[in-house]
Structure formats: C-alpha cells, structure tokens
Amino acid sequence: MAFYGIFFFYIIFWTAVVSPTPILNRGYIPKTNNIDFTIEKVTLAPDGFTRQLSTVNGQFPGPTIEVNKGDRILMKIRNKLGESTAMHAHGMLQRGTPWYAQCVIPDDYEFTYNFTVADQVGTHWYHAHETMQYVDGVFGALIIHDPDDPFKSEYDEEIIVMLNDYHHTNAQILLKQFLTPEIPDNGLINGKNNFDCSKAPPGSKCVDNAGLAKFEFVKDKKYRLRIINTSAFSAFFFSIDKHDMEVIEADGLYTKRNKIHRLPINVAQRYSVIVTANQPVDNYIMRSEFQKTINLPNIKAIVHYEGAPDDPEPKDNPWSDSLTEYVDLDHKTLQPLEEEKIPESTKKFEFKIDFHKNSTGVVKAFLNNSSYIPDINFPTLDKIFKKKSFNETSANAYIFDKDGEVVDMYFINSDDGEHPFHIHGYQFWVLGTGNGDKVDENELNTHNPIKRDTATIPASGWIAIRFVSDNPGAWGIHCHMICYRFIPFLFIILFFFDKFTNIFFLYFHFIFVLRGM
C-alpha cells in the first residue's frame, strides 16, 4: 500500500496543474464537491425479485451528483466489489483525469477522479466502465446546473427520471451466455417497478406488487424532467398520459423547443423536457415503452397530483389510444438553441460495420473488415509513451497528428439492428442519418446541426458526424449496447501524441505499474 500512496499523489498534483479556470456570470463562485463512493455488492429487490446487485453506497440506482458549472469534482471511488472496477462520467470531458483510457481500480483499492466542469452543463450520468458492472447497478445521475440556464424561468422544479432494462441474472453470467442483445426480465423507472412473480424461477425469493416510482405534481406548476436511459440494450418511448412535453436539452446541450407526445431515447442518451401539470387533479401513468422486438409490458411509474387520492394502479390512457396522430420526437428536427457556424471538413473517413464469424467461429464486430484486438501486455498509452509502433489494423486505431483538423466520419451499418454509439472525449455534430449503404451527401445538414455525444446508427442505414480534433489523447468510440463492447464494436482514435506524451508519461507509468501489482 505504500506504493499506492505515491501513485495517488501524482494524480492530484497533475490534475491541479492542468484543470482550466472557468468564467461565470451572475457572481457565482465555483466550489469543490467531495464525492465519496463505495462500490459494493448488496442484496436488494427493486421489482420484488431478490438478487445481489453491485451498488454505489448501497443504493440502486446510485446517489445523484449535483454540481454547478465551474465546480470541481473530487470523486473518490472505494472498490469493495471483490473485482476490479473503473468509473466513467458519461458525456463529461473530465479534463484532469485519466478519462476513458485508464487501468482498472483493483479490489480493495481507492482512486480519486479530480476534474472541473468548466464549460459543460446539463444532464449526464456516471457508470462503471469495467465488464458489465453497470448492468448490475453501478450507475447514477450526474447533473451540471447552469447559473445562466436560458430556460430557468420557465419551470418551477426539476425531476430526474432514470430508465433502464433490468435482468434478474448477474451480468457476468449473462456475458458468458451471450454476445448478442438479451431480452431483459423487466424494466425500471428510478429503480422501481412491479414484476409478475409467477414468472420467477422455482426457489426464487419474489414479492408481487413491489411498488412503482411516484412523482409528485402540483396543479399548474411546470417541471423540468431530466430523462436518462441507463439501459444495457434497450431503447424506449417515454411519455406521460395526457401530458405533452417540450424538449429543451439533448445530451447536455440546449435545443430549440420541440413539442412532442412521446420521446424516443436510446441507450446512454439524455434529454430534458418541460411538462406542465395542466390536467385535472388525479393520478396518471408515466410510461416507458420498450422499442422494437422486446415483448414486455410497459414500464410504469405514477404521476400523483397534490390533492388526488392515492392510487397504486391509475387508469391506462396512453397517447396511442387517445390520439389518432401523436407526435414522436424526430431527432432530425433537433436544432441547437444558439446557431453555431461549423467549420468545413478537412479529413473524411468511412466505416463499414459488419458482424460475422472470425477464423475461430466466434461472432465479432468488424469495422472496415478489422476487429479490435486489445493488447493486454502493452496498453495503448504505454505504447505511445514508449514510442512503439501501432499495428493500426488489429488495434482499430486511427491517428490524427494535426491539432484542429475537422473530421467527418461516415458509419455504414449492414446490421439489421440499430447501434447507439458514443465517443469519449468529444462531442460531435450530427450531419445526417438515412437508410441504405451509401451516405447521401446532398442531404447533410452543415448549416445548423445538433451536437451530441451519443447518437444512433440506424439499422441497415448510415450516420454522418463531424468534430474538431482538439482534445489530445487516446479515445474510444464504441456501441453503448453493452454486449457489443465484448464482440467488440470498438475502435480507438489517437490525437497528436507530441502534446501529451511528455506531460502524461510519469502519471500513466504509475498506473501501468499499479495494474501489474
């Protein structure tokens, strides 16, 4: 443990040097938020079915982190899982940490992430980024409040709504059983739902009517719902019976108002919507409908108006029954609240996504006929620091050596399933999506496209994105349907080594040695 103390010192020293100082309006003084998390296994029954979950501070979902723009976060992770772990703040750049490319935190060790949220706001989440731990419960909401929120005067309260598919089997067992999406046993809203215990395996401990999540509304008040899809595999349609919604945020970025009835939300995506409590005082169903081929009942919660009697089972009245034409959010109509002139592209890549058996008969993901092969003995960053060459094909590594390059990436999906993909360390403009195996460049929106960190590649279709290479590092791009990380649907983008090898060498050398202890 003596060596670990030295290792920890260098993390704190380095982060204090490089974290930027934010500039804020309205006289807000940034502060340091000390977050203390213990990751451990606890036996719980969120839907009435008892099983062991991996939890944050014994809670499922984990505690919400709420800070303000400009604040510093010191997030200490104590690992008591009995296995290694790592934590990722999804959607956050996390400048001042090892970001995504870190070695794991061994069992019975602790690690402190130290970063400043200088220029990001909005709805995010944190989750384990080791094997399938977040499927077992290691996740929670991370909210960055904005002192200059342009919509602040238009809602009275905020409510966090976390959606997820849910398995009664430990995720590590699931991983051994499949490398394709699995039908979940249930779905939860804020960690709650009922389950039909007649479907539980013999010998299981299960209680019917475990109870639904309950959200308190006051007549005529307006609510900002921060909606997060923390699923392993499942996309949803989110709605509240009799209440329409106005979208104002997507993945931490403000949008122009978009009035809808149902919100399609894919894995790892986040939205904020404003809902007005303008219906008669009563109880209403909040619902999250599984998309596509998953034949499970709607996930439900209760919206309870102040003054209404308690009702554990409000009457079902979905938009599909009450309207002949209801409006689902079309992501193509999303526009940033403030227009942004985007630069012209200077480099272009096209990636064809396939899934087929490799030479050993195992189904793998291939990007341009190459499948990512991790080098356990020589991690990516260690290769960079030691000036080793890359086998770019087997590593699925793409190297950018110029600061400020404007990169277009086209993803062509030959699979009959959609893929929500995420880029670490970057946000990107979504220029367009479509069907077929060829990008229609005439249809690309280069005038005022939405910016995101998680977007959907359509089934048998394509997506075109653009970003500026301005964040040095080794970053992963991967499908956020978690089983595809083990096929693996993953590749690495490497940005201008000369800007970070000398600064990071000692820091990551300690991480590498610690991993080998």
Language-model region placement:
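Extracytoplasmic beta-sandwich strand-turn segments characteristic of Greek-key/jelly-roll folds
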Residues: 56, 60-67, 73, 89-119, ...
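Divalent metal-coordination and catalytic microenvironments
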Residues: 37, 75, 87, 122, ...
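Signal-peptide-cleavage-adjacent N-terminal segments of secreted and extracellular proteins
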Residues: 17-80
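Extended terminal and domain-junction accessory segments
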Residues: 20-36, 132, 136-174, 255-418, ...
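Asparagine-centered strand-capping/turn motif at beta-strand->loop junctions
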Residues: 77-81, 227-231, 410-415
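Acidic-aromatic/histidine active-site loop/patch
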Residues: 157-222, 228-231, 356, 364-365
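Active/binding-pocket-proximal capping segment
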Residues: 241-255, 414-447, 482-486, 494-498, ...
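Cleavable N-terminal signal peptides of Sec/SRP-targeted secreted and luminal proteins
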Residues: 3-20
